[in-house]
Each structure stands twice: as structure tokens, then as C-alpha cells.
Amino acid sequence: MRLGLLMFLPLLLLATRYRAVTALSYDPTWESLDRRPLPAWFDQAKFGIFIHWGVFSVPSFGSEWFWWYWQKERRPKFVDFMDNNYPPGFKYEDFGVLFTAKYFNANQWADLLQASGAKYVVLTSKHHEGFTLWGSAHSWNWNAVDEGPKRDIVKELEVAVRNRTDLHFGLYYSLFEWFHPLFLEDQSSAFQKQRFPVAKTLPELYELVTKYQPEVLWSDGDGGAPDHYWNSTDFLAWLYNESPVRDTVVTNDRWGAGSICKHGGYYTCSDRYNPGHLLPHKWENCMTIDKFSWGYRREAEIGDYLTIEELVKQLVETVSCGGNLLMNIGPTLDGIIPVIFEERLRQMGTWLKVNGEAIYETHTWRSQNDTVTPDVWYTSKPEKKLVYAIFLKWPISGKLFLGQPIGSLGETEVELLGHGRPLTWTSSKPSGIVVELPRLSVHQMPCKWGWTLALTNVT
């Protein structure tokens, strides 16, 4: 009897293991895939940096949609730019050799990303123009190894980010390409044919994941084709079940026409999405420092860039409503991050050094912003009995009126982050509290562009 049990034990363990594996596996259906819990690190991170870089950085005019606006829509602004600056017969493909990345230094980029306070980065491995920032075998002579830089940009940044920072490394990938012959052929068949995803999109997606192991896979650009044309659910089932990043990878919602804001890991819904209220599903506000372009554009004026005050406001509003902020920059054709982007990144890092406690690893509170003082937004850490009130304007009176928190005498404590001393507060009628802020000179302020009160034991 005992011998029989010993002989049966390996089979029992195998069966148990099989049940555990299958319990965590996902079928290639949205119903199954949408049940996958989002890896915890993403919600804890709160803040990431988006980098739009490609051949569009060579003309660096108008936006990263330069090729489309010039050749497809024939917008006068773009046609005139080419007529005035390039010889007749110049093609968009001719920009490829001019995309030199001459001064691209992945270590410098990584150090700047670390200084920004961001916890993840997403690089455009391929935008709608089809040029890949790695040596894709499926993008012959239209990739960064064969043309222009003659370097594997994706690999260099991946190594630098993982060796020099605590950021999670992510990749953006455009499913479609504006002018690829196979995509245009499929499009003309109302997407009954699938030559393009089979020959181009899917092989590149599998290669990106296996070769660079991104922890964010940011899909975009469905070209009007549904998810079944892209074979999205089969790919995501592999990503979640078998890929080398199956336990940590997060994905967005742009996997085919009709999937956005409906299916996927977290929702982006639209560019610059900031609903201003709590959502039932994890979401991300992907936005740009340059108000009018994701890629670098040399004709931008100073007023076209969001100020640090506006960026802090975006971050605070987004996190208070349960989202992550993905803030975009655009490097130049030779690999330099323009000074104005560098300044904004470093300013965000400076602000987060003081106020990061109220951002990273926080939860939403019962109220997202205050009813009495509108420029106050709330986050919380329930396990520490903490509520954070982030206020974007310092009141002239020196008193901050908060309509939402309810304090308890002898229990509630209030502290200004970066100041370190308890503050005096009183109850307010009909509800809320009034906090007496410290009298500080400009040089004594813990930060410049928004401040945080840590409230202990409030309801």
C-alpha cells in the first residue's frame, strides 16, 4: 500500500501542477484575456516617460505625421516646407540616411529618465512610417541597423535603462504602416486578406518581446482594421501564457478597431485622456509636453510647451483619479533631448523628490478633489491611515480650507511634506478642516509648483 502511494505521488504532483498552470492560463478571447489581473507594479508606478523618435525627427516639422500630411493629405503647409527646403524628387525614404542618431547616448538618456522620477519608459520601436529602431529582418533597409544610425537603438536603451535605473522598460509598436504595399492590399480587400500582419506585424511583435522583453507593450495604429485581422487575441494569449515577460508585462487597449477603452490591460481611450473623475478600470493619460506634436518639431515656440505647473497639475489630477501619467518627449534627429524637455524632466524629478510619497504606490480616496478648494486633489495610503491633500495654489491667507477630510481631536495630525513639523488645524463647519500653513519665504518652500499635506487619521 505504501509503495503504491509512493508510485502515485509523482502523478499526483504533476496533476496538481497542471491544474495550477491551467488556472493561470488565458484563452485567445477578450472574455478570458480581460480577466488577467494587471501586474501590481504598473499601478504603483504612476508616472512614465514616452519617447517618440524616428525618421519623422529628420524633417522635424509639423508633427510625427509629417509623411501622411505631406504625401497623402497634401496639406499646403507641408508641401510648401518640402518645396522650400528640399530638391525636386526628394522622397520621404531619403530622410532615412539623414536620421543619424550621431549624439545618441543611451546612458545619458537613462540618467535623465532616472532624474525625472519616472518609474517606466516607453520608446517608439516603430511608428506608422514603418521604420524600426532595431534591425528587424521584416523591415528590409528601413530600420536603424541597415539605415541611418546603423545601431540597434532599442537594445542600447534597454541595456542602459536596466543597468542604470529603477525604471521598467517598455516599447511602443504601431500595428499598421501608412504606405506598406501589403497593408494597402489588405485594406483594399476590406481586411479579408491578412498578408500584412502575417508577414510583418506579428513576426515583429514576437521578436520584440522575445529579444528585448519589454514590461510595457504599447500597441497603437490599427489602421481601421478589427482585432481579428491583427490576430490580437492569439498574440496576447501567448504574451500572457508563454512569453518571457508573462508575469510582469502590461498592455494597453489599442489592439484593433473597437478595442480601445474596452479591451486590454489598461485603458488609454484617446490621446491626452484625462476624464477628471474616477474610472472603474485602470487607465493611462498619455500626453505631450509639446501641445501639438509627439515628435520633435523645430518650429515650436515657447508657448507651445506645457509649463511645469501645468505638468504637475496633469500628474496630480491623473493619479487622484486612478490613472498613470505617460509624459512624452521628442528627441532630435541626432539623438539629443532638447533642453526644454530636459528641464521639464528634471523639474518633475525635483517635485517628486518632495511629493513622491503622495504619488507612488498610492490609492484613490473616497473623494478625488475638494469641494471647497477646487485646486486640491486627494490620494491615500489606507494601510498607513494616510490621506494626501495636494494643493496647487498656496492660499494668500495662509489658511487652507479642506471640505472633505473629517478630523478627530487628539488623533488627526497634519504635516506639510518637505517641512517636517506638525501643523495646526481646526474643524470647519459644516464639515472639513482648516489648516494653518507655515509662514515660509520663497527660499524656505519645500518645492515650487504644488504642495502636499499628509493627513493622518482622517475620515
Swiss-Prot record:
<dbReference type="GO" id="GO:0016139">
    <property type="term" value="P:glycoside catabolic process"/>
</dbReference>
<feature type="site" description="May be important for catalysis">
    <location>
        <position position="286"/>
    </location>
</feature>
<dbReference type="GO" id="GO:0005764">
    <property type="term" value="C:lysosome"/>
</dbReference>
<dbReference type="InterPro" id="IPR016286">
    <property type="entry name" value="FUC_metazoa-typ"/>
</dbReference>
<dbReference type="InterPro" id="IPR017853">
    <property type="entry name" value="Glycoside_hydrolase_SF"/>
</dbReference>
<dbReference type="GO" id="GO:0009617">
    <property type="term" value="P:response to bacterium"/>
</dbReference>
<dbReference type="Pfam" id="PF16757">
    <property type="entry name" value="Fucosidase_C"/>
</dbReference>
<keyword id="KW-0325">Glycoprotein</keyword>
<protein>
    <recommendedName>
        <fullName>Plasma alpha-L-fucosidase</fullName>
        <ecNumber>3.2.1.51</ecNumber>
    </recommendedName>
</protein>
<comment type="subunit">
    <text>Homotetramer.</text>
</comment>
<dbReference type="Pfam" id="PF01120">
    <property type="entry name" value="Alpha_L_fucos"/>
</dbReference>
<keyword id="KW-0378">Hydrolase</keyword>
<feature type="signal peptide">
    <location>
        <begin position="1"/>
        <end position="23"/>
    </location>
</feature>
<dbReference type="GO" id="GO:2000535">
    <property type="term" value="P:regulation of entry of bacterium into host cell"/>
</dbReference>
<keyword id="KW-0597">Phosphoprotein</keyword>
<dbReference type="InterPro" id="IPR018526">
    <property type="entry name" value="Glyco_hydro_29_CS"/>
</dbReference>
<feature type="glycosylation site" description="N-linked (GlcNAc...) asparagine">
    <location>
        <position position="369"/>
    </location>
</feature>
<dbReference type="GO" id="GO:0004560">
    <property type="term" value="F:alpha-L-fucosidase activity"/>
</dbReference>
<keyword id="KW-0326">Glycosidase</keyword>
<keyword id="KW-0964">Secreted</keyword>
<comment type="function">
    <text>Alpha-L-fucosidase is responsible for hydrolyzing the alpha-1,6-linked fucose joined to the reducing-end N-acetylglucosamine of the carbohydrate moieties of glycoproteins.</text>
</comment>
<feature type="glycosylation site" description="N-linked (GlcNAc...) asparagine">
    <location>
        <position position="163"/>
    </location>
</feature>
<feature type="modified residue" description="Phosphoserine">
    <location>
        <position position="293"/>
    </location>
</feature>
<keyword id="KW-0732">Signal</keyword>
<comment type="similarity">
    <text>Belongs to the glycosyl hydrolase 29 family.</text>
</comment>
<dbReference type="InterPro" id="IPR000933">
    <property type="entry name" value="Glyco_hydro_29"/>
</dbReference>
<dbReference type="InterPro" id="IPR013780">
    <property type="entry name" value="Glyco_hydro_b"/>
</dbReference>
<dbReference type="InterPro" id="IPR031919">
    <property type="entry name" value="Fucosidase_C"/>
</dbReference>
<feature type="glycosylation site" description="N-linked (GlcNAc...) asparagine">
    <location>
        <position position="231"/>
    </location>
</feature>
<dbReference type="GO" id="GO:0006004">
    <property type="term" value="P:fucose metabolic process"/>
</dbReference>
<dbReference type="GO" id="GO:0005615">
    <property type="term" value="C:extracellular space"/>
</dbReference>
